[in-house]
Every structure is written in C-alpha cells, then in structure tokens.
C-alpha cells in the first residue's frame, strides 16, 4: 500500500472513532468540560472542523491560505465564535469539513509541499498531522466523557510526528536543542516495537507508545507516564515535547495534584 493511501485509511478510521463518541451524545454532553482549560466537548469539535477547512484551503489555494495567515485569531477566539452552533449542526460541520479535506488530500502526492501555520510540510506529514490532531482532540473528548479508548497501531503516525517535531519543542520556546541525538524505542499497542533515531544514541526514550503519544501531544504530565528516560537530552526533550504547531502548549498538571 502506498504511504498516502495508508495515511488516508488511518485518518478515516481515526475520524470514525471520534464520530462514534459524538453520535450518541445528548446536547448537554457537548457542553461538558474537557481537560483543555476552558474548552468543552463542542470546542474540541469546532476546532477540528475549522482547521479541516483551513487544511482544504491550504491544499486548494496555497497562496490565498498563506495570505490569510496574519488575520487568523487565537484558537480560543475561534472556539468562542462557534459556541452558538447547536450540536447537530456542529457535528454536521465537522463531518462535511473532514469529508471535503479527505477528498482534496486524496489528490496529493506524498512529497507535495503544503503550507501551514508552522513551516510548510510534505503532504504525507500534513495528513499525519491531521491524524495526530484528531487523535489528541478525540482523547480530550474521551476524557471528558469518562471513556477509555482502546489504543491502536495508528498511534505510530502520532509517534512519527512527535519524534520529528523534537527540534520544534525547543525552537518555539527559544531554547537551544541539545546536539546529542535521542533514540525512541516504543511498544505499540499490538506488541511490536517501533524505533526512531540512531541505534547507538546514548540518550533514549523507552516505554509504551500510548504514553509517548500522550506526552508529545501534551495530554499527560510526564510524571504520569510509564516512559523511561535515559540521559539528560531525552529528559530535556520530553519535558517540552510538542507535536503540534503554534505557541508553547501549557501541558497538563500531574494527576496527583
């Protein structure tokens, strides 16, 4: 299977997993608070829908997308603007925006360049980023509803972008990136071991892929993970790891607090 087809299949599956959480919800549950400060379930969904529309624009009209970047307000403002929308309409918006973006993604070659809010990306990385966002915001929704989702091997896409974004976590905070390489050795939900980085690196991040993915998307405090960090460069990275574009995220407090 070629890379783009695999990514699109997995993005479709990740989307369906979120839709299954949302479909049975009574309207009141769309207002439940999620672990993201100030965001209800509805805000997680409007966020995805808005950025799906932006993703379609980035692919179909890259110049127009780039020209509009300076006018984009904060994600909190975008969430506020959509708060008057009734839940059935909001779910419809998400479905339509996601469906349209999937259609335009299907016409891309893995190596095509797509502009975005951070640096431009290859089409493969771009679709991977949408999957990562869908999974991470879906996690917030699941947490709000008290649902434990079964992790899948689709997490390898989130892990890939999390690993590649190592320089970004430092750059976005104006910090120098340690020169030493870091290796990642993660156990996938299906039991296989997934690795990235030089085999002889002295600094290593080891543990469950789920924990790594929660950490790089800032959905968990590092102290609440089962990750083993070998070497200072590994710890320095994981303390600020950020797989998503935008300003430094606030992360999550330790569960014990």
Model-identified regions with their sequence ranges:
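Short, helix-capping/interhelical loops that line the mouth of catalytic, cofactor-
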Residues: 1-6, 53-107, 112, 154-155
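C-terminal interaction segments
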Residues: 201-257
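Glycine/small-residue-rich hydrophobic helix-like segments
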Residues: 175-214
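Acidic-glycine-rich active-site phosphate/pyrophosphate-binding loop
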Residues: 20-23, 106-114, 187-191
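An N-terminal domain-cap segment
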Residues: 1-46
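Amphipathic, well-ordered alpha-helical segments in soluble domains
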Residues: 14-17, 21, 51, 97-100, ...
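Short, contiguous alpha-helical
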Residues: 29-71, 116-172, 212
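Hydrophobic packing residues in well-ordered alpha-helices of helical domains and bundles
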Residues: 8-11, 41, 91-94, 127-130
């Amino acid at each position: 299977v070629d890379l783009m087809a695999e990514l699109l299949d997995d993005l479709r599956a990740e989307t369906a997993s979120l839709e299954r959480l949302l479909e049975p919800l009574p309207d009141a549950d769309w207002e439940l608070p999620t672990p993201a400060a100030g965001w209800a379930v509805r805000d997680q969904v409007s966020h995805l829908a808005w950025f799906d529309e932006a993703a379609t624009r980035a692919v179909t009209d890259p110049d127009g997308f780039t020209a509009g970047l300076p006018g984009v307000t904060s994600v909190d403002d975008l969430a506020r603007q959509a708060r008057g929308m009734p839940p059935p309409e909001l779910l419809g918006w998400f479905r339509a925006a996601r469906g349209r973006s999937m259609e335009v993604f299907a016409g891309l070659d893995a190596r095509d360049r797509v502009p975005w809010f951070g640096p431009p990306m290859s089409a493969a990385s771009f679709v991977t980023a949408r999957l990562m966002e869908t999974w991470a915001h879906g996690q917030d929704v699941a947490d709000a509803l008290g649902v434990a989702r079964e992790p899948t091997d689709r997490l390898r896409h989130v892990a890939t972008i999390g690993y590649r974004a190592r320089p970004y976590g430092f750059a976005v905070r104006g910090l120098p990136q340690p020169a030493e390489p870091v290796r990642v050795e993660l156990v996938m939900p299906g039991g296989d071991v997934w690795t990235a980085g030089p085999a002889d690196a002295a600094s290593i991040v080891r543990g469950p892929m789920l924990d790594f993915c929660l950490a790089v998307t800032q959905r968990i405090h590092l102290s609440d993970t089962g990750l083993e960090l070998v070497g200072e460069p590994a710890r320095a990275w994981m303390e600020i790891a950020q797989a998503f574009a935008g300003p430094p995220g606030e992360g999550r407090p330790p569960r014990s607090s």
